[in-house]
Amino acid sequence: MKNIPYQQNAINELTDKTIRLLNLGGKRHKIVFEAPTGAGKTVMTCQALANITDELKERGDSRYQEVAYIWFAPRKLHLQSYASLKNAFGETRKLRPVMFDEIDQSEGIQPGEILFVNWESVNKESNVMVRENESFASLYEIARRTQEEYDLPIVAIIDGGCKLNCVSKE
């Protein structure tokens, strides 16, 4: 990544705020990270996730030392983001981008894994990823296992392409 001051400032702020919210505990804290098209949001987010992973291990005052991630994106954008991050972390292996069929569903998301999910597979009527069946655990079950069995917090990244279409069904 090029050393562009506004990007570095955004990465540092995103890293610090995320760790502060993780240390608060509880659920569903929100950070909104917006930047114009072409500003490098994916690159900055990628670097922030790497920084979060490093700093949680290094800080003595962190509530957690490890974290798991779920990255939601609409249409085929999750595949593009997956490929970008797989390329970015290919050499360092600091974080491990994975697709739903690549994780051990009986165990959940492992520390440092980024699970890439198509938003429509969760939010549309067919919502295949949130229904239990004989072949696959639901995303809810995988998240539960991740949190309960590994005591890992999950940071959800809602890709900016979802801005108008990704509305929570709470």
Task: Give the positions of each predicted feature.
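RecA-like P-loop NTPase motor core of helicase/translocase proteins
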Residues: M1-E170
